C-alpha cells in the first residue's frame, strides 16, 4: 500500500511574496492563543450568552431563564468567558451582573453574524 505524502517538495516560486507575508506573520504562541479564543465561540450557549450581554448586562438567574438552562450551566460558561476576558462582572448587594468586557467582543459577535448572513 502506498503512503501518500502531502508535503510540497517544490522550490519557492515567489520569494518576494513569501518574505513579505512572513514579515507579517505573528508568533506561534499568538496563533495558539487566538485558536483558544475561537474555541470559546465553538459553544452555542456561550455565543448566546455573549449576544444577550451585548444587549444588556444581566445576572445569572436572568440568563438562565432567557436561555432555558440551569444557573449552574450559565455560571460554568460565564467562568470560561470571564477567564478569557470576554465578560466582566460587578456586584450590587447579593446580585452579580455580567456584561461584555469591551467593544471588541461586540465586534467579534457582530462580524460573525455579518459573515453568517452575507449573500
Task: Place the predicted regions along the sequence by residue.
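N-terminal leader segment of winged-helix/HTH proteins
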Residues: 1-41
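N-terminal helix-turn-helix DNA-binding core of bacterial DNA-binding proteins
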Residues: 26-70, 96-103
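Base-recognition residues in the alpha-helical recognition helix of bacterial helix-turn-helix
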Residues: 51, 76-77
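Alpha-helical residues within the helix-turn-helix
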Residues: 65, 76, 82-83
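Residues in the helix-turn-helix
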Residues: 73
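Beta-hairpin "wing" of winged helix-turn-helix
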Residues: 82-92, 99
Amino acid at each position: 500500500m502506498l503512503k501518500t505524502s502531502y508535503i510540497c517538495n517544490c522550490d519557492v516560486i515567489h520569494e518576494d511574496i513569501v518574505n513579505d507575508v512572513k514579515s507579517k506573520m505573528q508568533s506561534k504562541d499568538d496563533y495558539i492563543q487566538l485558536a483558544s479564543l475561537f474555541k470559546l465561540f465553538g459553544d452555542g450557549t456561550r455565543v448566546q450568552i455573549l449576544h444577550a450581554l451585548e444587549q444588556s448586562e444581566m445576572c445569572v438567574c436572568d440568563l438562565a431563564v432567557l436561555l432555558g438552562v440551569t444557573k449552574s450551566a450559565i455560571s460554568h460558561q460565564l467562568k470560561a468567558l470571564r477567564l478569557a476576558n470576554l465578560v466582566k462582572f460587578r456586584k450590587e448587594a447579593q446580585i452579580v451582573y455580567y456584561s461584555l468586557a469591551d467593544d471588541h467582543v461586540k465586534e467579534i459577535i457582530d462580524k460573525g453574524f455579518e459573515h453568517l448572513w452575507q449573500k
